[in-house]
Amino acid sequence: SKHHTIYYNSTTDDVVKSKKQDFTLPDDYQIIKHTPLNYLIRFLASGFAYLFTYGVMHVKVIGRDKLSKYKDEGYFVYGNHTQMVNDVFMPLTLFGWKNYYAIANQANWGIPVIGKTLLPYGGLPVGKNIKQAIKLLKAVKTLTKENAHIVIYPEAHVWPYYTGIRL
């Protein structure tokens, strides 16, 4: 069968875990990178995102036009984290490769490929200590002034294809 059942005890359970769930970035990690390599990686990732999102995953986006009128303004998007891989790529197809950022748990930087090649160029790591938390808040403030589009998955855990609200 293609389907399997996932059991949980509370809506805060982490039902999908990475091998490096306790991965921690150094305190001196540079969050915002405005470099030619940054733009190249983002551009290439965006092309892959279109192919993967629409060609492989067959995603259909309803209401895309509502976002396009705000493309030159900064905004936050709150969404359910429902797909292990495509939640990283699909926003690139919706918000553009230049201005898209995502607030993410540091464990994601420990994931092979995505954590090493994509997150360093658009991920905003949630701080694990006060110094890192302040750094994140400053980065968000800077990006807000730059009209960035910031995605937040507030439940902080992947629940495959779950569409309900978890508090």
Located regions from the model:
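Membrane-anchoring hydrophobic helices of lipid-metabolizing enzymes
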Residues: 1-81, 86-90, 99, 115-121
